[in-house]
């Protein structure tokens, strides 16, 4: 049973949070109360919209988007979040800007932010670069605000980097809270974050890393499964281990999809490229080595093809708790016989859970809006209370 807006506001007001003083770049940099605040603010915004109450807290202002990789769900979720709050979106096309002519990050960050209240960045292609770039932008914004160049400090949101995908994992957590009733009900639940076969290579590590980095915060039993050699960034695996110890949950790694699925309450079969491959790919991309990239792709596709049995089938789902585990995916899934010949999941399994995955995805606009709101307002609970009190109809 979802809480009412008034109940959510009461919960938000009881939390100790400093999100208004920092950017949301990695989930494990935030305290449990700060994570709960984002979830509660998102739930309140979603409930207000369902009741046809306007949530436009900004009368003007821009939300800047910087996408250095392709995106559908996150791009539209970010645009939706901005509109939800009353901000207009402007996409920065780096190829058509002075960045292409050598303009510095410091200068660009300030030049685009005179009337900006939010900047969302996706930069996931280069290991060791995406999150670092976001922090460089953040430092430039801090300096611009401190020096009086900017009248306000825009909220900076990580829309996916090389390390984490916080808007995705937080949307996933919001969906799990909705599905199971509360965060408390997630304690002891087994979630299997598993690699799955895909006919493509080079998929980022940030989704599985985001899942193991966040779900271990809430006492869940997290199992990471992948074939030998498909490791994630070692530092993030250590984060997951430490999180599990602190929360009273567990974290383990296995090399069997069947073992991971056994008695799981939630399964998240998703392809990713091995950490070592992504390191090589980054070096080749930086060197603009097209022949090297082609050779690496050929090698990786051959390696992937050895593991076609890592496939989320009806038989695999039968291994889960009562054969009814919740299937999750960040989308788009590689559906065998639909979007590809052989992929991550069978058509039957995906169709059974298709609506569930759409509901999972539906949380992302509200999560992004909650991150922006929490960065811009020290007391989001009071702001939501005001919106509820005024109760201006969104559509008349």
Curated annotation (Swiss-Prot):
Its EC number is 2.1.3.-. GO terms for molecular function: amino acid binding; ornithine carbamoyltransferase activity. GO terms for biological process: arginine biosynthetic process via ornithine; citrulline biosynthetic process. Keywords: Transferase. Carbamoyl phosphate binds at residues 71-74, 98, 165-168, 330-331. Homotrimer. This is Putative carbamoyltransferase YgeW. It comes from Escherichia coli O157:H7. The gene is ygeW.
């Amino acid at each position: 049973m979802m809480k009412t807006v008034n109940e959510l506001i009461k919960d938000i007001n009881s939390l100790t949070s400093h999100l208004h003083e920092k950017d949301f770049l990695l989930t494990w940099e935030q305290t449990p109360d700060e994570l709960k605040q984002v979830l509660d603010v998102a739930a309140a915004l979603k409930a207000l919209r369902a009741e046809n109450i306007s949530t436009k807290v900004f009368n003007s202002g821009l939300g800047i988007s910087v996408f250095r990789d392709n995106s559908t769900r996150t791009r539209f979720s970010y645009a939706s979040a901005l509109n939800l709050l009353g901000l207009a979106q402007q996409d920065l096309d780096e190829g058509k800007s002075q960045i292409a002519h050598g303009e510095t990050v410091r200068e660009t960050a300030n030049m685009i932010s005179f009337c900006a209240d939010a900047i969302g960045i996706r930069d996931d292609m280069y290991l060791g670069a995406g999150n670092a770039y976001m922090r460089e932008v953040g430092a430039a914004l801090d300096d611009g605000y401190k020096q009086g160049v900017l009248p306000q400090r825009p909220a900076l949101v990580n829309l996916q980097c090389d390390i984490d995908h916080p808007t995705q994992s937080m949307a996933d957590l919001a969906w799990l809270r909705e599905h199971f009733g509360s965060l408390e009900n997630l304690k002891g639940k087994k979630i299997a974050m598993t690699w799955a076969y895909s006919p493509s290579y080079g998929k980022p590590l940030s989704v599985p890393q985001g899942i193991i980095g966040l779900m271990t915060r809430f006492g869940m039993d997290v199992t990471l499964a992948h074939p030998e050699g498909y490791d994630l960034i070692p530092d993030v695996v250590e984060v997951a281990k430490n999180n599990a110890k602190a929360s009273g949950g567990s974290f383990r790694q296995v090399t069997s999809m069947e073992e991971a699925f056994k008695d799981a309450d939630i399964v998240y079969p998703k392809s990713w490229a091995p950490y070592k491959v992504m390191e090589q790919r980054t070096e080749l991309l930086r060197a603009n080595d097209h022949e090297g990239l082609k050779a690496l792709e050929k090698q990786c596709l051959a390696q992937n093809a050895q593991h076609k049995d890592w496939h989320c089938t009806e038989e695999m789902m039968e291994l889960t708790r009562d054969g009814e585990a919740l299937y999750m995916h960040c989308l788009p899934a590689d559906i065998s016989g639909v979007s590809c010949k052989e992929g991550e999941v069978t058509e039957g399994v995906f169709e059974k859970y298709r609506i569930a995955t759409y509901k999972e995805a539906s949380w992302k606009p509200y999560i992004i809006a909650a991150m922006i709101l929490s960065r811009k307002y020290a007391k989001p609970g009071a702001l939501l209370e005001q919106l509820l009190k005024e109760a201006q109809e969104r559509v008349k």
